[in-house]
């Protein structure tokens, strides 16, 4: 399976993207900064005051390269892409499944099992790697709660019950997340999840990396012919990529949380890399965004053996593989969708 894993993230304010030959040309104040072959990209993400020429947008549409626009701090604005790929029969099957209560509950349960399973492994890794810097009792207790949530999910058929168990697991996980942060800087203490806006540096990093992952997962779903807006765990809402958010749950901890923990614990992100507004909202400065994006791209190039398929692949291909497995399940080619659980 050959997929281009490169997403071009443009964060420098005032950048202008244009087409020159088969390359995307990035200029600032009419001065060329770099050029990148378009055939090497699977997406372009523009943050803040970044503009694109109509010719570039048209060519990207022809090549199937989605161009996404976000605010400077990562809030989704819009996405431009060419004709939707995929089999209409697959999408019809997806919509029928999303309208079926029992089938929706089944998939919602599997997404949550994947999420909690990976969260449990993240806590176990923190205890194993840093036993002298963590409260082992707290981490073990949280792992026990998560294991209990997974057992209860095995028999859960009610959608609201499934979401309730997910919330219980998230509360237990984030109640000890601060134990996974081994850096001594008090600026990176974590007291709980906050969003829209994030109210501390750790939440700011988490929200931003989740945004990057959502973009890539959305593209993977579309490349497999699925509609990223028709989800099972997350309810329909205009403009919300519910299915992309469903699949994101499997990868929040394994990719997003561990990446943020690594950057903090290794001292690659510093307290001075953030701005705090009068309202308490926290936002990354440009250097911090670039550091996180670079680390994210590097993480996507690392290899892992897929626990279900049994083949080695780049981390950045995991959501493509999960999207393919989900499409096969919806078509009836396999009996059950196997959520990704890191072992």
Curated annotation (Swiss-Prot):
Lineage per the UniProt record: Bacteria, Pseudomonadati, Chlorobiota, Chlorobiia, Chlorobiales
Pfam family, one: Cas_Cas1
Keyword line: Antiviral defense, DNA-binding, Endonuclease, Hydrolase, Magnesium, Manganese, Metal-binding, Nuclease
InterPro entries the record matches: Cas1, CRISPR-assoc_Cas1, CRISPR-assoc_Cas1_C, CRISPR-assoc_Cas1_DVULG, CRISPR-assoc_Cas1_N
GO BP annotation list: defense response to virus; maintenance of CRISPR repeat elements
Cofactor(s) listed: Mg(2+); Mn(2+)
Binding site for Mn(2+): 166, 234, 249
Annotated organism of origin: Chlorobaculum tepidum (strain ATCC 49652 / DSM 12025 / NBRC 103806 / TLS)
Record-listed E.C. numbers: 3.1.-.-
Function: CRISPR (clustered regularly interspaced short palindromic repeat), is an adaptive immune system that provides protection against mobile genetic elements (viruses, transposable elements and conjugative plasmids). CRISPR clusters contain spacers, sequences complementary to antecedent mobile elements, and target invading nucleic acids. CRISPR clusters are transcribed and processed into CRISPR RNA (crRNA). Acts as a dsDNA endonuclease. Involved in the integration of spacer DNA into the CRISPR cassette.
The protein, known as: CRISPR-associated endonuclease Cas1 1
Main EC class the enzyme belongs to: hydrolase
Superkingdom as given in the UniProt entry: Bacteria
Subunit: Homodimer, forms a heterotetramer with a Cas2 homodimer.
GO MF term set: DNA binding; DNA endonuclease activity; metal ion binding
Family the UniProt entry places it in: Belongs to the CRISPR-associated endonuclease Cas1 family.
């Amino acid at each position: 399976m050959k997929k281009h894993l490169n997403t071009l993230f443009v964060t420098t304010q005032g950048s202008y993207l244009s087409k020159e030959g088969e390359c995307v040309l990035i200029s600032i104040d009419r001065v060329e900064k770099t050029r990148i072959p378009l055939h090497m990209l699977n997406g372009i993400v523009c943050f803040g005051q970044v503009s694109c020429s109509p010719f570039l947008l048209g060519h990207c549409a022809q090549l199937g390269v989605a161009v996404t626009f976000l605010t400077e701090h990562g809030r989704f604005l819009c996405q431009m892409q060419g004709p939707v790929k995929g089999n209409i029969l697959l999408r019809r099957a997806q919509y029928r499944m999303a309208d079926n209560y029992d089938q929706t509950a089944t998939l919602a349960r599997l997404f949550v099992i994947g999420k909690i399973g990976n969260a449990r492994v993240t806590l176990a890794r923190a205890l194993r790697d840093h036993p002298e810097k963590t409260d082992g009792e707290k981490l073990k207790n949280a792992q026990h709660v998560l294991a209990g949530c997974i057992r209860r999910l095995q028999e859960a058929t009610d959608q609201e019950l499934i979401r309730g168990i997910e919330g219980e697991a998230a509360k237990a996980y984030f109640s000890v997340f601060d134990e996974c942060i081994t850096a001594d800087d008090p600026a990176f203490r974590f007291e709980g999840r906050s969003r829209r806006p994030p109210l501390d540096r750790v939440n700011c990093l988490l929200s931003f990396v989740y945004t990057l992952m959502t973009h890539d997962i959305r593209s993977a779903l579309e490349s497999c012919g699925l509609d990223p807006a028709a989800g099972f765990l997350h309810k329909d809402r205009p403009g919300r990529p519910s299915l992309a958010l469903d699949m994101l749950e499997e990868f929040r901890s394994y990719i997003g949380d561990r990446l943020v923990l690594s950057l903090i614990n290794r001292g690659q992100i510093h307290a001075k890399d953030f701005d705090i507004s009068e309202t308490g909202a926290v936002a990354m400065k440009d250097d911090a965004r670039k550091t996180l994006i670079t680390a994210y791209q590097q993480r996507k190039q690392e290899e892992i053996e897929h626990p279900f398929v049994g083949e080695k692949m780049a981390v950045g291909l995991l959501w493509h593989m999960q999207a393919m497995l989900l499409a096969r399940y919806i078509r009836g080619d396999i009996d059950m969708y196997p959520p990704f659980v890191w072992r």
